[in-house]
């Protein structure tokens, strides 16, 4: 039995327009809006996983600026079974590519949202708390 689920994700800020925007993704399986994130692959660091997950879910090449926070909550593996502690390591990132390309299965939409409006769009309280760190 797994003791905890380890995951990592990225919070990408765009400051190229008049307002600061953050990138959110929609996952049809959960019908939620969140930050790009996912579980670590075997042998992968949290930093490597965060960069990989952002690229897989958004198509963006990004680099880590700094670690932002760890979010801890209970989750089910694949919607079934007992609740397991989950730890998500979040990193502030900047993009080195501009074209967003979502895979369509895990993520079907990626949207730049004004930082002041992101809390209204985000589904989970633990994600909304991360906005205070930006």
Regions found by a protein language model. Give the residues of each.
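NUDIX/MutT-family hydrolases
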Residues: 90, 94, 99-132
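Residue-level signal for short segments within beta-strands and strand-turn junctions
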Residues: 12-14, 26, 94-95
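Short aromatic/basic micro-patch
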Residues: 34, 85, 112
